[in-house]
């Protein structure tokens, strides 16, 4: 009887020990499985992150490529710039290398109109077509009805300097001068204004061009010739578009003018635009 009881107790302890061992194995299995799953999830998450990053890198690369294409649209073509003064060529070349714009400021009276169909607007469009968008930044400062003396009195040099010009293409308002006081002092006043402009807009290259021809004038052409001499003697580039106009002593000039002693008509702006375009964009 005692022997059977001992056997039962032994079996009980054996089963208890076995159940403890099974429990330990179960816990170990659960922990191991959880660790394995966590690792698998972590690996999967890591791969997803890499894929996302790769896509992002491709997108950035595409953006950079697009930026290069945009930059490539604006470039310095030495063949186009061969007519320009060396100083201006260097400015254009450096601007292209630095991916910046050359600030060209066109100054004048109604002859250098800021209107859409005027020569200045046509030149702006042609510069963009040839050199690409962004290399030339063109601003037109049209001082309607202001004589050369009034440009000085109104301190227009300081206003122009605010545009931070690299190049200034100045058309002294000789037609306006003629209508107000005559052209007797036009060249002397031009000299004063150009000197003021040189001081206010330090570093800018100043180029001079005449107003358009007018019909049947006597003294006005002499003043224009004196302007050309002033520019040449003082080493200012003179953009002489007069050679492309019809003979102003004949009525053949009239279709190119708004009135006999006036500013350019649409046809006048077209031939003026063609000349300055050929100057800035050599063929």
Model-flagged regions — what are they?
Residues 2-102, 281-283:
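N-terminal secretory targeting modules
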Residues 87-91, 149-161, 188-196:
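Alpha-helical scaffolding within the catalytic cores
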Residues 95-182:
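Conserved SGNH/GDSL esterase-like catalytic core that processes O-acyl groups on lipids
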Residues 128-132, 165, 173, 195-202, ...:
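Sec-exported extracytoplasmic/periplasmic mature domains
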Residues 171-172, 196-228:
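Active-site segments of SGNH/GDSL-like serine hydrolases
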Residues 183-194, 221-225:
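Charged helix-capping and loop-helix junction motifs
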Residues 216-283:
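Catalytic His-Asp segment of secreted/periplasmic serine-dependent ester chemistry enzymes
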